[in-house]
Design a protein with these regions (language model features):
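A short glycine-rich, Lys/Arg-flanked "PGG" loop and its adjoining helix->strand segment in the class I
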Residues: 163-178
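Conserved Class I S-adenosyl-L-methionine
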Residues: 226-291
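N-terminal auxiliary segments of SAM/dcSAM-dependent transferases
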Residues: 1-39
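A short acidic, Gly/Pro-enriched loop at the edge of an enzyme's catalytic core
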Residues: 138-149
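Short alpha-helix
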Residues: 205-221, 227
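Class I SAM-dependent methyltransferase SAM/SAH-binding core
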Residues: 81-139
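Conserved alpha-helix/loop element of class I SAM-dependent methyltransferases that forms part
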Residues: 43-47, 60-78
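Short, glycine-/aromatic-enriched active-site segment of Class I SAM-dependent methyltransferases
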Residues: 184-204
Length: 291
């Protein structure tokens, strides 16, 4: 039998490490925006709790329910050791710890996101259950077989080396563990011009197709339990997200400047429209580590 050919993405735009960091450092969803939302809560003398943040710290397609779905599909419970890969400002990590009682480690490449995640986690009293580490997802600082569950949401589109990423997930996960993630994927209609522009404007690198992900996961010892095409659902969600971001235009301008606000709107509009042309799509994959 011929050796299985590994997925090798065509990198239309290979970005320096700091480009992705800069992208998230100037993101409309940021510490300032979240702190303003907290101040607007009418808590009176009530202490800030994790659920108070759920309305605005779940920066993922489908919001809280999408995060809950990953937890349910991975059969998360109080005994689970969970790794959130590309954890951002930590909303899902806090949700998992609060709702399921598990211990969660979040890793993110962007230090400002990690610091915000730590601050918010301290504010809601979950620092004993949730830890955040600055780390490259392709070189994780963990021992072999350290986690039962690995989750991620719409972040691996920024990582060019999908093979090494999945290899690291396999290494740090114990046999029988579950990987549950969602990501932005390309469809056959995606043109080189589109992918290059998304690389420059959205810092997407080496976008995989659904079949690419399945191939990589199986190569690294995972058995696919679910690979759901979310393209149609996300096409609807993203139109609403664009409206949400436009509602933050004044705050984005105040924090990052008018030029960045205009640049973001142009880039995100183009991104959202690629779902209408079906050049881009979404996937939710659940896989068990079998070897």
């Amino acid at each position: 039998m011929p050796e299985q050919k590994m997925f090798q993405p065509r990198i239309h735009t290979r970005l320096p490490d700091n480009t992705v960091i800069q992208y998230y450092d100037s993101h409309p969803i940021n510490e300032s925006q979240i702190m303003d939302a907290i101040k607007s809560l009418d808590l009176r003398d009530e202490p800030l709790r994790p659920h108070h943040l759920f309305a605005f710290d779940q920066d993922h397609f489908g919001g809280l329910e999408a995060t809950r779905t990953l937890a349910q599909l991975s059969q998360m419970n109080a005994e689970s050791a969970v790794l959130d890969v590309c954890s951002g400002v930590g909303g899902p990590s806090r949700f998992f710890a609060d709702q399921y009682g598990c211990r969660v480690t979040g890793i993110d490449f962007t230090e400002t996101r990690r610091k915000t995640a730590i601050k918010l986690t301290e504010m809601v009293g979950l620092s004993d259950k949730v830890t955040f580490i600055q780390s490259d997802a392709t070189e994780m600082p963990f021992d072999n077989n350290e986690f039962d569950i690995i989750v991620a949401q719409e972040a691996w589109c920024h990582i060019s080396d999908k093979n090494q990423l999945i290899s690291e997930c396999s290494r740090v996960m114990g046999t029988g563990g579950t990987l549950a993630f969602t990501d932005i994927v390309k469809h056959d209609a995606a043109t080189d011009r589109t992918l290059e522009r998304l690389g420059h404007e959205m810092t997407f690198q080496g976008l995989a197709s659904i079949n690419d992900y399945v191939s990589i996961l199986e190569h690294h010892g995972f058995t696919i339990k679910e690979a759901s095409d979310l393209t149609d659902e996300w096409a609807r969600i993203l139109v609403k997200r664009l409206e949400m971001y436009r509602g933050l235009e004044q705050k984005t301008t105040a924090v990052h400047g008018e030029a960045r606000a205009i640049e973001w709107d142009r880039a995100y509009s183009f991104f959202v429209n690629r779902y209408q042309t079906r050049e881009l799509g979404g996937v939710r994959i659940v896989a068990n580590k079998s070897t």
